[in-house]
Design a protein with these regions (language model features):
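N-terminal cap/leader regions of alpha/beta-hydrolase-fold enzymes
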Residues: 1-254
Length: 254
């Protein structure tokens, strides 16, 4: 598990704007209904971002993260993966996520992502990014191989060994990535060996896309957490890199 119910995202360095959040139910092309949370900035900065959660789906950490993005001016939409198998119920600590993770289909993930991006673009035709955490980081890298018109993707501690129903792992598909990538990893994360991170960097070179792969040497998996004060400097740097990445590739995508 990546984040529990007590986890909260660190505050961004440029926080100070106002934001409004609302729960939504979106519908994919196949009729699947899934939960989402939209955070709307009072003063939009010209970009928007789709948030892929960890294995627990759309829980409080990601609703808060959407609001933190919106407070920097970035319109944000966090989505849940499990509408097809777990319905629309809240995803708290009692949610038994693994049976639903095992039923995930990559084609269904892409369908839900398309519906979410369509919703964002209907409300504002601005550059769109994707950010994901843990399994969401893996899915972010896989999504980056699709023709979705993204400006860039950001992957936190993306696992590279999960094969989604024979589609291949994030590492298998890395040479097919189409958009700029910011990858953020913990050097003390036992689940993601440094050799895999180095191989991801190499395969993104082969893909020919701009990329910045960053490892924080002593940080564990899930270091990006307000209560993980030992890694506050890494979290602050991750925020700075994310906002700079969004600003840079918002300009180049227009």
């Amino acid at each position: 598990m990546c984040y529990d119910d007590k986890a909260r995202p660190p505050m961004p360095p440029t926080n100070g704007g106002q934001a409004q959040g609302q729960d939504l139910v979106l519908t994919a092309a196949d009729g699947n209904q899934f939960a989402a949370f939209l955070a709307q900035p009072e003063s939009p900065a010209g970009a928007q971002i789709l948030i892929y959660p960890d294995v627990r789906g759309l829980h409080g950490f990601y609703k808060d993260l959407a609001l933190r993005f919106a407070e920097t001016g970035v319109r944000a939409l966090a989505i849940d993966y499990f509408g097809r198998t777990a319905g629309l119920a809240p995803r708290d600590d009692s949610f038994e996520f693994m049976p639903h993770v095992q039923q995930l289909s990559i084609s269904n993930i892409f369908a839900d992502a398309q519906a979410a991006l369509d919703y964002l673009r209907e409300g504002a035709d601005r550059p769109a990014f994707v950010v994901g955490f843990c399994i969401g980081g893996s899915l972010t890298l896989l999504t980056a191989g699709q023709d979705l018109g993204l400006a860039g993707v950001i992957a936190f501690y993306a696992g590279m060994s999960r094969d989604f129903g024979g589609y291949g792992t994030a590492l298998d598909r890395a040479t097919q990535v189409k958009y700029p990538v910011l990858g953020l990893f913990g050097g003390a994360d036992p689940g993601i060996p440094p050799e895999q991170v180095a191989e991801l960097d190499s395969r993104l070179d082969q893909a020919g896309v701009p990329h910045d792969i960053v490892t924080y040497p002593d940080a564990p998996h899930s270091f990006f957490d307000r209560k993980a004060t030992d890694y506050a400097a890494a979290s602050a740097d991750a925020w700075r890199r994310m906002l700079s990445f969004i600003e840079t590739y918002s300009r180049t995508s227009t």
